[in-house]
Curated annotation (Swiss-Prot):
Its main location: membrane. This is Sec-independent protein translocase protein TatA. Part of the twin-arginine translocation (Tat) system that transports large folded proteins containing a characteristic twin-arginine motif in their signal peptide across membranes. TatA could form the protein-conducting channel of the Tat system. Keywords: Cell inner membrane, Cell membrane, Membrane, Protein transport, Translocation, Transmembrane, Transmembrane helix, Transport. It holds the Pfam family TatA_B_E. It is found in: Cell inner membrane. The gene is tatA. NCBIfam families: PRK01470.1, tatAE.
Length: 54
């Protein structure tokens, strides 16, 4: 029950229409930075829990 290629294509088309070609690289860059910050935060949270358990 995952996303098929056609679903992904429709989502990308909607994003392209909403943001336009000019802003799309900036939006993707901001999204990547947000995901990286989230992953780093989750990794830091995991190491904090390990220290508390010892």
């Amino acid at each position: 029950m995952g996303m098929s290629f056609s679903h992904l294509l429709i989502v990308l088309l909607i994003i392209f229409v909403l943001f336009g070609a000019g802003k799309l690289p900036q939006v993707m860059s901001d999204l990547a930075k947000g995901l990286k910050a989230f992953k780093d935060g989750m990794k830091d949270e995991g190491s904090d829990n390990d220290k508390k358990n010892n």
